[in-house]
A protein has these predicted regions:
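Short, well-structured N-terminal submotif of metal-dependent ribonuclease cores
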Residues: 1-49, 62-75, 144-148
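Alpha-helix capping/helix-boundary segments
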Residues: 18, 53-54, 92, 112, ...
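Acidic catalytic patch
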Residues: 25, 52, 80-101
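Short, flexible helix/strand-to-coil boundary loops that buttress conserved ligand/catalytic motifs
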Residues: 23, 61, 100, 135
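Short beta-strand scaffold positions
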Residues: 14, 48-49, 87, 107, ...
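Short active-site oxyanion
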Residues: 42-47, 82-84, 120-123
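Acidic, PIN/NYN-like endoribonuclease modules and their adjacent C-terminal/linker elements
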Residues: 1-7, 11, 85, 113-148
C-alpha cells in the first residue's frame, strides 16, 4: 500500500467520496486517509472542497434518517479548521461548463474539478479515475494506492 502524501505547497482538494470514507471509517481507505488527515493537521496544509460535497455526502444520511452521520458530515465540512468549503460561484460554473464540454465529466465532477483548478490545488484526492481527463489536475486515485 502506498502512502497518500500531503502536498509540500499549495492546497489539497478532497472529493466527496474521500469524505465519505473518512467519516464512515470505510476500510480499506481509512488506512490511507487517517495518516493523510494527521499530516494535514501537522503541516497546516489547507484542504479545499466544493460546497457540492455537502450535497453529495448528506444524501444517504438524510435518506436513512441517520441524524448522527448527518451531524458528523456537517461538523467535518463546516467546522473543521482543516477544511475550507468553496462556494459554487459563477466563475466555478463557467470553468465547469468548459471542462464538461472538453472532458465529458458529469456536472458535479466538473464543478469539483473547476473548484480545484480555480483554487490552485496541487493535489486532487478522489476514487474516480475519470478526473484524470482534466488537464492540469494532479489526481491521486485512492484505489491505486491499495495493494493488488
Amino acid at each position: 500500500m502506498g502512502p497518500l502524501t500531503v502536498p509540500p505547497a499549495g492546497f489539497a482538494y478532497v472529493d466527496a467520496n474521500a469524505f465519505v470514507y473518512t467519516v464512515e471509517r470505510i476500510a480499506p481507505y481509512r488506512a490511507l486517509l487517517d495518516p493523510f488527515w494527521r499530516d494535514v493537521r501537522a503541516s497546516g496544509t489547507s484542504v479545499v472542497t466544493s460546497e457540492m460535497t455537502l450535497l453529495e455526502v448528506l444524501v444517504q444520511p438524510l435518506r436513512q434518517g441517520d441524524v448522527l452521520m448527518e451531524s458528523a458530515f456537517r461538523a467535518v465540512l463546516a467546522t473543521s479548521p482543516d477544511v475550507h468549503m468553496v462556494p459554487i460561484a459563477r466563475a466555478v460554473l463557467e470553468r465547469a461548463a468548459a471542462l464538461r464540454a472538453a472532458t465529458n465529466l458529469k456536472t458535479p465532477d466538473a464543478i469539483h474539478a473547476a473548484t480545484a483548478l480555480i483554487e490552485g490545488c496541487t493535489l486532487f484526492v478522489t476514487n474516480d479515475a475519470l478526473f484524470r481527463r482534466v488537464p492540469g489536475l494532479n489526481v491521486t486515485v485512492l484505489r491505486d494506492l491499495l495493494p493488488p
